[in-house]
A protein has these predicted regions:
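ATP-binding N-terminal substructure of ATP-dependent carboxylate-amine bond-forming enzymes
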Residues: 1-92
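Generic beta-sheet signal
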Residues: 3, 66, 128-130, 161
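Hydrophobic anchor at the start of a short beta-strand
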Residues: 26-29, 117, 128, 161
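Short gly/pro/ser/thr-enriched loop/turn and capping motifs at secondary-structure boundaries
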Residues: 33-37, 96-100, 193-195
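Glycine-rich phosphate-binding loop signature in dinucleotide/nucleotide-binding domains
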Residues: 58-63, 124, 157-158
Length: 210
């Protein structure tokens, strides 16, 4: 099976590695010819998919299934359009993505289903963390440890920013994959982060605390 992975940074690198481990042939598309996943893919087409560069359209059409590995809204919309145009199965749900990319929407879903999540200011107590509702990779995240920092953060808070309790401890992740009526969870992984690279390593198996 040929899988077309669109996006060659962290997510795309993981996808190319796992595709190879599963015996699948990976076709990578990215506008940047120097992305890290380029060396892992069986085939790499560098070009602008949004502008429908001929080389990347040909690569797209040669795949059996399409896997977006990016968080660019314009590019994701184009991927959905092209998948429908060329009749390609798409491993992506736009409606689910609209929830998961928004911390406000995903927290609302957790609360509605009785799943604990950090309290929003003014509930809870210091330390807090201020971050954009959308986005990932710790971009725009600021830890608030004192009343003075909280006062300053409230004055500079941008539209769409949220302030929540800061939770100490390890970070875990679990994947859910499926189609309507048939979903399953996979192994729990631990996400390792540092100040220089944000997420620099994912490990499994994980021993969860009681």
């Amino acid at each position: 099976m040929n899988i077309c992975i669109i996006g060659g940074r962290l997510q795309g690198t993981e996808a190319c590695y796992l595709a190879k481990a599963c015996g699948m042939k990976s076709i990578l598309i990215d506008i940047d010819p120097e992305v890290p996943a380029g060396g892992l893919a069986d085939r790499f087409a560098a070009g602008d998919l949004v502008k429908e560069d001929p080389a990347v359209i040909e690569a797209f059409r040669s795949a059996d299934i399409i896997l977006p590995a990016n968080e660019n809204d314009e590019l994701l919309a184009k991927i959905c359009e092209l998948a429908e145009r060329y009749g390609k199965p798409l491993a992506f749900d736009p409606e689910a993505y609209e929830i998961t990319k928004s911390k406000i929407k995903s927290d609302r879903l957790f609360i509605e289903n009785g799943i604990p999540c950090p309290k929003y200011y003014p509930d809870g107590r210091l330390p807090y963390v201020m971050k954009p509702s959308d986005g990932s990779g710790s971009t725009g995240v600021k830890k608030i440890s004192t009343e003075e920092e909280l006062s300053e953060a409230l004055k500079n808070k941008a539209e769409g920013d949220i302030i929540q309790e800061y939770l100490e401890g390890p970070s875990y992740s679990i994947e859910v994959i499926g189609i309507p009526g048939n979903y399953r969870t996979y192994t729990i992984t631990e996400v390792h982060v540092d100040k220089g690279y944000d997420c620099y390593m994912i490990t499994s198996p994980v021993e969860l605390p009681e």
